[in-house]
């Protein structure tokens, strides 16, 4: 029966065996925890059987689709070991917020260029007007992710560990910060 199938999948328990079998649902929190635990076990098994990659690809990798781009940004922040520089609008920053907070808690330097309304305690924040969906992220002066999320599922970004591209974007972010600081000075006078 359908209820027996739910028992096999871990979504229900059998209350009594006998002439009449009764079922009770597993609490949603418990069911989800069980499934997540099982996925973690599968993840560890798969990872233990995969060959170890020496480093990220040396070339330029194109990532397509908003969800995949956000996932790459989050994973790049999670894998950073020293510092993160990110330039994006408030909407994108909110999507990265928990990973950035975690990075700060790990002692990483986090520099943010975003809308004036977005702030993150302990991070160095530069407020400006960011109306487009353009994103730029540099991690550990070794990795760059850049592109835009304007076209949602048709959005694309570039991921690379190429030194020349990383240096180019470091200079671009430094210049953006200098421009923000100059504009602040103009607003005061």
Residue ranges and their predicted role:
Residues 84-88, 111-112:
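Short catalytic-loop micro-motif centered on adjacent basic/acidic residues
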Residues 77-78, 138:
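A short, aliphatic-rich alpha-helical micro-motif
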């Amino acid at each position: 029966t359908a209820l027996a199938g739910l028992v096999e999948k871990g979504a229900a328990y059998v209350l009594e065996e006998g002439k009449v079998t009764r079922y009770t649902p597993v609490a949603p929190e418990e069911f989800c925890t069980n499934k997540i635990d099982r996925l973690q076990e599968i993840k560890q098994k798969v990872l233990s059987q995969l060959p170890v990659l020496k480093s990220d690809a040396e070339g330029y990798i194109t990532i397509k689709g908003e969800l995949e781009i956000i996932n790459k940004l989050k994973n790049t922040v999670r894998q950073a070991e020293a510092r993160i520089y990110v330039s994006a609008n408030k909407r994108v920053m909110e999507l990265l917020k928990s990973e950035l907070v975690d990075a700060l808690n790990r002692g990483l330097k986090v520099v943010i260029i975003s809308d004036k309304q977005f702030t993150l305690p302990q991070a160095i924040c530069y407020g400006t007007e960011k109306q487009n969906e353009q994103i730029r992220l540099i991690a550990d002066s070794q990795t760059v992710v850049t592109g835009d999320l304007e076209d949602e599922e048709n959005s694309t970004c570039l991921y690379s560990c190429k030194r020349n591209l990383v240096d180019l974007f470091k200079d671009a972010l430094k210049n953006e910060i200098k421009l923000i600081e100059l504009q602040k000075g103009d607003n005061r006078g």
